[in-house]
Curated annotation (Swiss-Prot):
Thin filament-associated protein that is implicated in the regulation and modulation of smooth muscle contraction. It is capable of binding to actin, calmodulin and tropomyosin. The interaction of calponin with actin inhibits the actomyosin Mg-ATPase activity. Residues 28-131 form the Calponin-homology (CH) domain. One of its GO terms (biological process) is actomyosin structure organization. One of its GO terms (molecular function) is calmodulin binding. It comes from Rattus norvegicus. Belongs to the calponin family. Smooth muscle, and tissues containing significant amounts of smooth muscle. The modification Phosphoserine is found at residues 48, 175. GO terms for cellular component: actin cytoskeleton; cytoskeleton. Pfam families: Calponin, CH. Keywords: Actin-binding, Calmodulin-binding, Phosphoprotein, Repeat. This is Calponin-1. The modification Phosphothreonine is found at residues 170, 180, 184, 259.
Length: 297
């Protein structure tokens, strides 16, 4: 295989648009800061093109070995493509063990095939931030916050359950004292003032509105008969056995002779059918009378 790097064809359409947006996020000032930091740690010159100088992975492997000795056991000086890709892969594994988060690390092709230089720069900035937390004097990136663990006794934790934290807001010394359930009566009197006791529960207070003397006396359940006479006037009671015209008329019909739903219905009239005769005990069993048939549906 030749020593030339892999070359991709030009990007078109959406791929070109995405590549241009990523390129616009690249910070050249940060690049200069990273160049000075890496060259100062390794003692090697990167070259005029920053990304091309890091593409073989040699400087990157030496750089992580300076920050964390023994991170990369073998650095390939060969110009073959697979050796250079191996160097980049070893660098990625080393910074992962160093503490850089996986979502901050670039892929090998982002650098080797020039697909995403912005992500490569972000990885180096994340490495600088991690180096600061380990005591290295770096002027690039921001220092990660150190973990501050606190241990509390179980008694102290139980006491905290009785306190409303300011995170939840403050009740301003308000309480639910004197509050009643939703929908119940509210009495507008103060027992300390010696005022009269509230009305009995059978009276509707004016706070709830007024019924204007109306009551539910004489009201019946929905669907039942409504008597249209007044007993106080001496009127006669309505006959409850008859269907009043207020409910409509049955035109003299009744349920007499009706059977339960599903039973057989007799379709003969006894006036036109002979009564069956049965032989007496002393008579012969044969009867010459015509048979009577009972037809049923």
């Amino acid at each position: 295989m030749s020593s030339a790097h892999f070359n991709r064809g030009p990007a078109y359409g959406l791929s070109a648009e995405v590549k241009n947006k990523l390129a616009q996020k690249y910070d050249h000032q940060r690049e200069q800061e990273l160049r000075e930091w890496i060259e100062g740690v390794t003692g090697r010159r990167i070259g005029s093109n920053f990304m091309d100088g890091l593409k073989d992975g040699i400087i990157l492997c030496e750089f992580i070995n300076k920050l964390q000795p023994g991170s990369v056991k073998k650095v390939n000086e060969s110009t073959q493509n697979w050796h250079q890709l191996e160097n980049i892969g070893n660098f990625i594994k080393a910074i992962t063990k160093y503490g850089v988060k996986p979502h901050d690390i670039f892929e090998a092709n982002d650098l080797f095939e020039n697909t995403n230089h912005t992500q490569v720069q972000s990885t180096l900035l994340a490495l600088a931030s991690m180096a600061k937390t380990k005591g290295n004097k770096v002027n690039v990136g921001v220092k990660y916050a150190e973990k501050q663990e606190r241990r509390f006794e179980p008694e102290k934790l139980r006491e905290g359950r009785n306190i409303i934290g300011l995170q939840m807001g403050t009740n301003k010394f308000a309480s639910q004292q004197g509050m009643t359930a939703y929908g119940t009566r509210r009495h507008l009197y103060d027992p300390k003032l010696g005022t009269d006791q509230p009305l009995d529960q059978a009276t509707i207070s004016l706070q709830m509105g007024t019924n204007k003397g109306a009551s539910q006396a004489g009201m019946t359940a929905p669907g039942t008969k409504r008597q249209i006479f007044e007993p106080g006037l001496g009127m006669e009671h309505c006959d409850t056995l008859n269907v009043s015209l207020q409910m409509g008329s049955n035109k003299g019909a009744s349920q007499r002779g009706m059977t339960v739903y599903g039973l057989p219905r007799q379709v003969y009239d006894p006036k036109y059918c002979l009564t069956p005769e049965y032989p007496e005990l002393d008579e012969p069993t044969h009867n010459h009378h015509p048979h009577n048939y009972y037809n049923s549906a």
